[in-house]
């Protein structure tokens, strides 16, 4: 029997809470509770990083230097060690993680750290067909000051598969939610787009969803077979700044982007 998909929510001073997928998706009548906006101005800072299960030194230093000022931190391969949970609950109002698979002590998966509570939370998992392990994704939504709702997708795509059937299957339920969402969207993470088939499928998905890709002038993203693995796509906002941090704290370099939520044109 397949294990139930859920997210674990971490909030300072409270026990961890298990969050199951909502009964109604965001676009078909999910009730949104009133919440404090994610930002109070027009700029939204986002950090995206495959943190390699915190296996290398200096990962905490990178988060402390670059993550604590971001409104959203989208981590992949985040292992819920006491150190990471402490950082998340100290600098952020809430952290939601979707366990993809359980390691000896702490589960690993995508984790979204946010400066405001999500009004919607939909955890997703897809099983790797060859290794029989899972990759996870998380769809969350946050109110913005302009009365719009921002949809955020944090994804770690399946890696080892023959062809792109499972790869496309993982994007399917995400696309169903994005295409019906009326407000701005961010989808980011480790897409494992290391083949021509995969990158073509990813770009086709982005076109169908009306998404634009964040471009980096000095592109130091982790590559496999000459193709980048990490991406940020967006809709309904403009890009003010975008950069890739070079570090040895993981086998991936973090992506930093600052959006202007009041414009749909890129400023850089």
UniProtKB/Swiss-Prot annotation:
Swiss-Prot/TrEMBL keywords: Cytoplasm
Q: What does UniProt give as GO cellular component? A: cytoplasm
A molecular function annotated in GO for this UniProt entry is: catalytic activity
- Where is the protein situated, by its record's location annotation? Cytoplasm
Q: Which domain of life is it from?
A: Bacteria
**Keyword NADP listed:** no
The answer to whether the entry has keyword Cytoplasm is yes
Recorded hits in HAMAP family, A to Z, give: UPF0294
Family indicated by similarity: Belongs to the UPF0294 family.
Please identify the protein, giving its name as recorded: UPF0294 protein ETA_26410
Specify the species.
Answer: Erwinia tasmaniensis (strain DSM 17950 / CFBP 7177 / CIP 109463 / NCPPB 4357 / Et1/99)
């Amino acid at each position: 029997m397949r294990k139930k998909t859920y997210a674990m929510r971490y909030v300072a001073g409270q026990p961890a809470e298990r969050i199951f997928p909502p009964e109604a998706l965001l676009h078909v009548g999910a009730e949104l509770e009133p919440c404090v906006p994610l930002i109070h101005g027009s700029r939204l800072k986002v950090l995206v990083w495959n943190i390699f299960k915190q296996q290398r030194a200096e990962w905490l230093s990178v988060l402390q230097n670059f993550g604590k000022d971001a409104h959203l931190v989208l981590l992949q391969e985040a292992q819920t060690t006491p150190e990471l949970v402490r950082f998340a609950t100290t600098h952020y109002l809430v952290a939601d993680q979707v366990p993809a698979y359980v390691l000896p002590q702490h589960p690993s998966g995508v984790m979204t750290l946010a400066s405001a509570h999500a009004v919607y939370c939909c955890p997703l998992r897809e099983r790797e067909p060859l290794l029989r392990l899972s990759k996870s994704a998380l769809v969350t939504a946050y109110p913005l000051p302009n009365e719009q709702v921002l949809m955020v997708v944090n994804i770690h795509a399946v890696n080892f598969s023959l062809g792109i059937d499972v790869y496309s299957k993982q994007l399917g339920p995400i696309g169903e939610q994005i295409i019906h969402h009326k407000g701005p969207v961010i989808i980011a993470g480790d897409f494992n787009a290391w083949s021509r088939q995969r990158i073509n499928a990813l770009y086709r998905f982005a076109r169908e969803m009306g998404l634009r890709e964040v471009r980096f002038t000095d592109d130091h993203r982790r590559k496999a077979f000459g193709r980048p693995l990490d991406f940020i796509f967006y809709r309904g906002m403009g890009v003010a700044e975008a950069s890739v941090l070079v570090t040895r704290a993981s086998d991936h370099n973090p992506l930093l982007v600052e959006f202007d939520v009041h414009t749909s044109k890129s400023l850089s």
